[in-house]
Amino acid sequence: MSYIQVLQLISFAFLMSGGQVLFKKTALSISAGLNNENSLGLIEGILKAATIPWLYMALFTYGIATLFWLYILQRIPLTLAYPFSALAMIIVPILAIFLFGEKLNWSYWIGIIFIFIGITIIAR
């Protein structure tokens, strides 16, 4: 696999991760000011989500990522390309720490190391 192809796959993982962060921002906007006792039902939550710009940015990001994925799959076998999507399982939690103040336990960090090792082996 060429360096350009690896860069494309990493870029795809970052696009998907960005979409996930935007979906989280949407979810936080939906639940802003609510507690568990007066949380919105499914229909009310969907209707409120439709008014939140973060949702449209998330969907746009996923749309671009999907088109980019199709471009990638024209050039790289799925068996080589797909494991790189696991990079999102590394990127998203790290972003969640910095953007949302979420915490990761030690077992998650060990899992991240194994994911990174696996992707490195596949990329060779």
What are these regions (language model features)?
Residues 1-124:
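Polytopic alpha-helical membrane proteins, predominantly small-molecule transporters/carriers
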